[in-house]
């Protein structure tokens, strides 16, 4: 059984395929080479505080651009997560044939702080979509909306909110 078949079988049986630990660029190249397509690609890279210290801004920009470009070869929707001050500049890094669709904010109350001063109580996400990609808003409906959707009684399908509160 080749890798593409193994991934398809795993997704069919359990809804997910888990690759062994490896560098993200290697895993993406492996998936691309094997023709594996995903409905969405979710990226949550390290925040330039990796092994051996920090990369220069240019090196980190190139790292993020490579992740986004590789993701665009295997998915029509890409999410880039991180702290707002880290990912903010990457709004302009949409891969070719993609556009920024949304800036999502996930905030959490009662965030414990071990430092003095300001503490981050939110994460941000940039959503990039390929031209013509379906956003699947039906996946974000509440129970009442799901029922009306299934009965064909919705005048329009509301999109998800751009601010998500953590419980």
Name these PLM-found stretches.
Residues 1, 6-167:
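Core catalytic lobe of class I
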């Amino acid at each position: 059984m080749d890798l593409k078949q193994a991934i398809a079988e795993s997704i069919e049986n359990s809804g997910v395929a888990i690759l062994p630990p490896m560098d993200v660029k290697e895993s993406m190249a492996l998936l691309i080479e094997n023709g594996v397509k995903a409905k969405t690609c979710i990226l949550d890279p390290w925040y330039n505080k990796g092994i051996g210290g920090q990369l220069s801004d240019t090196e980190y920009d190139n790292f993020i651009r490579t992740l986004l470009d590789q993701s665009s070869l295997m998915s029509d929707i890409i999410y880039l997560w991180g702290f707002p001050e880290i990912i903010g500049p990457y709004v302009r890094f949409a891969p070719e044939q993609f556009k920024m669709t949304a800036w999502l904010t996930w905030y959490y109350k009662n965030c414990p702080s071990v430092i003095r001063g300001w503490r981050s109580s939110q994460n941000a996400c940039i959503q990039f979509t390929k031209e013509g990609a379906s956003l699947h808003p039906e996946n974000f409906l509440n129970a009442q909306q799901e029922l009306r959707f299934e009965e064909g009684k919705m005048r329009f399908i509301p999109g998800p909110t751009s601010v998500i509160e953590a419980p």
